[in-house]
From Swiss-Prot:
High-level lineage: Bacteria, Pseudomonadati, Myxococcota, Myxococcia, Myxococcales
Superkingdom of the source species: Bacteria
Family, similarity comment: Belongs to the RNA polymerase beta' chain family.
Protein name: DNA-directed RNA polymerase subunit beta'
Positions annotated to bind Mg(2+): 461, 463, 465
GO term, biological process aspect, one: DNA-templated transcription
Quaternary state and interactors: The RNAP catalytic core consists of 2 alpha, 1 beta, 1 beta' and 1 omega subunit. When a sigma factor is associated with the core the holoenzyme is formed, which can initiate transcription.
Catalytic activity: RNA(n) + a ribonucleoside 5'-triphosphate = RNA(n+1) + diphosphate
Amino acid sequence: MKDIFNFFEKPKDPLSFNAIRIALASPDKIRQWSHGEVKKPETINYRTFKPERDGLFCARIFGPVKDYECNCGKYKRMKHRGVVCEKCGVEVIQSKVRRERLGHITLATPVAHIWFLKSLPSRIGNLLDITLKELEKVLYCESYIVLDPKATPLQKGELISEDKMHRLYQEHGEDSFTTGMGGEAVREMLKSLDVEKLSEELRKDMRETTSEAKRKKYAKRLKVAEAFRVSGNKPEWMMLDVIPVIPPDLRPLVPLDGGRFATSDLNDLYRRVINRNNRLKRLQELNAPDIIIRNEKRMLQEAVDALFDNGRRGKTITGPNKRPLKSLSDMLKGKQGRFRQNLLGKRVDYSGRSVIVVGPELRLHQCGLPKIMALELFKPFIYNKLEEKGYVTTIKSAKKMVEKERPEVWDILEDVIREHPVLLNRAPTLHRLGMQAFEPVLIEGKAIQLHPLVCAAFNADFDGDQMAVHVPLSIEAQMEARVLMMSTNNILSPANGKPIIVPTQDMVLGIYYMTRAREFAGGEGRVFASPDEVRAAYDHGEVHLQAKVVCRIDGKRKETTVGRVLLWEVVPRAVGFDAINKVLDKKSLGGLIDLCYRLTGEKETVLLADRVRSLGYYNATRAGISIALKDMIIPAKKQEFLDFARKEVSEIENQYLEGLITDGERYNKVIDIWAEITEKVAQEMMQQISQEETTGDRDGKRETRKQPSFNPIYIMADSGARGSAQQIRQLAGMRGLMAKPSGEIIETPITANFREGLSVLQYFISTHGARKGLADTALKTANSGYLTRRLVDVAQDAIINEYDCGTMDGLFIGALVEGGEIIEPLGERILGRVALDDILDPVTGEVLVRANEEIDEDRVRRIENSGMDKVKIRSVLTCQAKRGICVECYGRDLARGRKVSVGEAVGVIAAQSIGEPGTQLTMRTFHIGGAATRRAEQSSLENRYAGSVKFAGLVTVQKTDGTLVAMNRNGEIVVVDDSGRERERYQVIYGARILVKEGQRIEPGVLMAEWDPFAIPLLTEVGGVVRYEDIIEGVTMSEALDEVTGLSRKTVIESKDPEARPRVTIRDANGNMMDLPSSRNPASYFLPQGSIITVNDGDEIHPGEVIAKVPRETTKTKDITGGLPRVAELFEARKPKDAAAIAEIDGVVSFGKDTKGKRKLIITPEVNGEQRTDLAKEYLISKGKNISVHSGDRVKAGEAMMDGSANPHDILKVLGEKELARYLVDEVQEVYRLQGVKINDKHIETIVRQMLRRVRVTDVGDTNFLVDEQVEKWVFEEENEKVMSEGKRPAVGEPLLLGITKASLSTESFISASSFQETTKVLTEAAINGKVDYLRGLKENVIMGRLIPAGTGLPNYKHLDIAVESPTDEVNEMEAALAATHGDTGPLGEPSRPVGTQTTGAA
């Protein structure tokens, strides 16, 4: 009886565990798991196809092949359950045990586990202090190792060859010492290790040693020893006596048709191990010669190696078709391994896919689902309903009925589908908006209909894209789909908080057309009392859609147009008429939807979006816009411009021929001229295409007026519907400069445009760019996907998990200014953040925002009006939450427009927001057809505001003609208004001519400074006579005759002589060195390699004149290609190729004696006004680099002293975490800004926080850390608090910046790390440490098949029960509301009467 009860017992819940531990398996453990030993390599009998006894598929060990049936057929069926057949020894039980029962192989000699032998650093070698090479010699039976030296002079662990051993035996006698070879010897040595003692000795050695290399070596060994000590693993378990055999159904043998068998590679690998093991056993029994046994042992070791990790050592074992066999490690590794193929990505049932087409009359929350698809997807629900309604009595008859597609079935399908959302997904799903929920509407045909407004989120178009449909089954799933994933709940983009549901293309065109005004249109100037009158007049054809009229709206007379009044009918009243009383292009429409969302909430916005969609399509159709050839107006002045440019270019060629400029400068100037002319032609063309004159009658008189053009091409670009000024330029202006495949710009531009047609040569030049674009796209898509994967992996466990961490720390944030221009105003950067302290008005002192209040739109306005320049806010970077992040530090959830909720997976959102545009950008390179777009190099400064000039830190020299020249590189020109408030500040480049005086009043647009953008000059501060020093023809300087010009140029070259320091000195008439006025040092100027000397020996020179100039490199086009790798480089925290040295301290620059081809730069700090040479820092900079500081300059800590990007690790060391974070955020933003992509700073901050999670221990104090160990910050702080509370010494650490790959691999969770990269390495490390994974991140829970600990899967919601009410047949209120508003619509859903916003209820 008891058996029966057990049979119906619920199986244990496989998910009821909280953590997973991984450790080494001891031989006893393996035997304990095993159900029997596999002794024979046979698999199945070729005649009966039954498994061989004791073979790899043996039924006695692994269980029966058929359910409840023993192998010989004596016992069959359930009644014999649990009996063991006395004939064939098979237990009568379900056959599925063959998926879980293990066997084992007892080895004749211990072998090393290859992971612990070869996975660097070798753990076995580390513990025994033997190099990997020597260890392999022992294991693969090539030399002997001394186990016990006894009285001989040998060392324990020393390797000796066979000859030497025999010699020693002769000297000292047979049993004077013990040696061993192969696995037994290594196992002996591991067994004799005392880990406790080893640990203590190593700690002592580390304290006593002085050599850094030794300390590192001890630390490495100590790490492994500690791991064994703490985890309870025994070192000898790294050697295997017993090998587990995995269940046969996991390495199946499948009969193919034609009598052949397909088998898993593991069976082959196991067979080799068993064969060799059996042979070794036999040889040992026969007492075979040592050399044969040794060879067999080596072969056994190799066979076991291949089974665990084929190809890791020696030759890869291949199958009959020369394909490497897949070992146990390969089953886990890589994209096709267990982790990524089956655990992180699974196929989903109840899903279908089809091509998508546009559904212009769908509502925003709907999608069109083909009937045949719906019938298949909702089958179980239909069967249930058919039975419930009494159409059928059994599931079988329901099936038949559905197959026949009887009319009742369709009625029931309608019923089933109502209010049952489905998920639509378009691959690649780059961010969470790539999967959204919709309510299905049944349609005929086979294509899914998609709402046009959600295309932007899915990045879908209708050129053959396919989408997948998934059905959420449970009530909870349907609820989540409706509440969280419904398209109507995803109006804002999580990346930047701006609406993502904005009209595009035709819709924009239609709305733009209807809000434009046309001069002399029918009914112009009429006055109406209400919008209803305008509608009536328009319906009766009395007024033109674009006529300018006056209408009373909300009690005020408004000058407007008919079209705008008609648009007003569909806009919520709260938005106000002024928001739409203008020409609405794409940007304004986005603004309108944003405004509507902020003022009236989600529901109204959805209704507005749908109505704007209908109006847009309707009016775009009515407008009848088309393109004709003559719409591409070629500017009349084009030829004139081209002639002028050619003249300029030939002048520059002449200058080059006369030797006034170098070839590089000539190239740069030519490119600049053409870039400028292309711009001019484009401007001229835009002017002609964008304005038109029109004549008409007004009060009986003919008159002519100018108005914005109705040229269709212009309309499309101006409205933002399609195309850009740049594309129009190529159609009707000139194509302009093109780039070579290498990225350089070809200096002859394409002067033709597409309307005129290109010549063969021009066409050929333009194919370069196009092809490069396509090739780039293919490569970059992969790169971008990989970047996203790394970002997700590093940030997956950043979850909002507490409300307030209580930190007192935050960041100062100001407007982002570059080149005097405000790129991002303060308001945009602080919107949605939380204030750290009270923010006070600087003038009145009133509180604008209280501490811990969210800075919303209203407060941003107040802060901006108060004129503050920076605000202290809370940030993810300074959040003190241990794991995860707190609500207050994160601030606003961008996709919802309110504070973030606990449980939001902000890390993944951040990763998607950064990764998604990466892919977008990569896919959008080729749209401009490779045309090189370079803005003419900036070479001057103009002010934008009136005010007076102040110089800040600017050192100048007056030239003989009275102009000032800037002599330092960190000077700035500041413009202040009358009250002394700073309006703008500009950095002045070294060597610039300054054209304004200090204190001068200037109007806007005055030229304040100008410089040569193509060369960096070296100027003299004093006048005198030039003398060359160490400038020797052919050694440090080459004088090259320019063939073209016949003139010579002196260029400084790298000298073979390390002592040579080419320099120019300035002397007085008597030949004495002059002193520099700023630093009292002698006036000698060192010339960097590659500089061109412009003065001759013995010339007289005046202050501010150029001694030499360094040409800037030829400019390449900026393209996100520079972008993606740059972003990856920043997130990986790599040292840039030519990293700029940055100053570690504040001080004064001087140059020392050069060494080995490097220049010595010295920074001397000043203490109380005097220079302390004892504290000076020295830097060696290779001669080829261009140093941007000059002798006597003052530098601040963290300032770059040469061209190039800074190394983030240096910034962290010198300036600390906040500055580093600011640098990373700004640099990443810079790349995206170039592409016009908006990402909120907090996303990048979230990733940077994950990169800065760890500390490197520099001094261990009395803690258990090791020197140079990397630990999580909070672990470090906790340990220190504990130690200090006991009155001991705390550890000291320095913050550590890890690249995203490194950070992912060093997470707490080994499951997450091993599924990311380097699977074997991570698992080896984890096993030795006996690591426990507490399943805190998202990834490890997905792998274990549990709910993720975020969102609705938070532990606190685990025991919530959902009460399900029976559904009532109420009509969706929103439907009703919309039916009311769209009552009788005109064609294409244009409302034909005024529509208020009298909608009620909520969906």
